[in-house]
Amino acid sequence: MSGNTFGTLFTVTTFGESHGPALGGVVDGCPPGLALTEADLQVELDRRRPGRSKHTTQRRESDQVQILSGVFEGVTTGTPIGLLIENTDQRSKDYSEIAQRFRPGHADYTYQQKYGVRDYRGGGRSSARETAVRVAAGAIARRYLAQRLGIEIRGRLAQMGGIELGAEDWSAVDDNDFFCADPARIPELEALIQEVRKAGDSVGAAVEVEVRHVPPGLGEPVFDRLDADLAKALMSINAVKGVEVGAGMAAAGQRGSAHRDELTPAGFAGNQSGGVLGGISSGQDLVVRAALKPTSSMLIPGRSVDVHGEPVSVVTKGRHDPCVGIRAVPIAEAMAALVVMDHWLRHRAQNADVESGTPVLPARDRE
């Protein structure tokens, strides 16, 4: 199975299945000398872990990460960093009924067609459980970017179902179960989750990530544009069906005079581009959004077929998120961190001695 490694110079390879003994990964390309402990990674893992909120899956995993290599006496050595997270709360019996049946809207059918065999327990490799290692790896990148470059990465729930959420108070994001920066709307979110759960259904969502204080110059045209790699990174997250950068799809309805981000000596007049021009960071904040479909794991019966192609009705049992978008926030932050870290190293490798001769314009503050 290929496709398990992400990045060019700062690479992450993950392994493991939802109900296997453990998840793991190898982070290669991290510069030496970065102060790093398991506790530094655990902070981010705790934001993502299942069972932390009554509004998400009730599978309870501690997601305790172990650093197996690449760190000596509290600092990175420049060698591969091995990570391991044990699975401790598998309940595989919940999935016995789908061993011969395909859940509609899931990867069961496509994995069977591609590999001829599949681990049906909790979705196996296709489960969002795999993203725990991404969050741990992203925490390494975030730590480097923050300490060495002053780059800040923050994310929020931007929409749940028909409820669109503003960025009213970023400081509130980690103080509620929804990663919501619009705290006045939280009662609406709670009511929607209760309604969906009672109906045995699920609901979609959108998340937004901002990467602040990014230096200009990151991105490798033409095929490894910064925005292209951000889109790829977010599209690799389970359930993501669409990605926008800056104005995104709204640009189709704009005029050029409104969309262009005019330049002044005092800085950019706007950020419709989402911090990327020509595939290269402009020094503005990177702004990306991802839309996540409502999970197909639900108690409402759905039509499908079995492994013999015969019609069946499927009800997905087990412990599932009624809205997978909630826990996607720290995952999206991690993937953005991996992209920016990788592009920083690539930029430094080729252009470390470049002096543009042009002043760096101040970024426009959205707050």
Swiss-Prot record:
Q: Which residues are recorded as binding FMN? A: R125, S126, S127, N238, A239, G278, K293, P294, T295, S296, S297, R319
Needs which cofactor?
FMNH2
- Which Pfam families does the record cross-reference, listed alphabetically? Chorismate_synt (PF01264)
Q: Which residues are noted in the entry as NADP(+)-binding?
A: R48
Q: Sorted alphabetically, which SUPFAM superfamilies does this protein's record hold? A: Chorismate synthase, AroC
Bound how, and how many: what does the cofactor note say? Answer: Reduced FMN (FMNH(2)).
Q: Which family does it belong to?
A: Belongs to the chorismate synthase family.
**Protein name as annotated:** Chorismate synthase
UniProt source species: Halorhodospira halophila (strain DSM 244 / SL1)
Lineage of origin: Bacteria, Pseudomonadati, Pseudomonadota, Gammaproteobacteria, Chromatiales
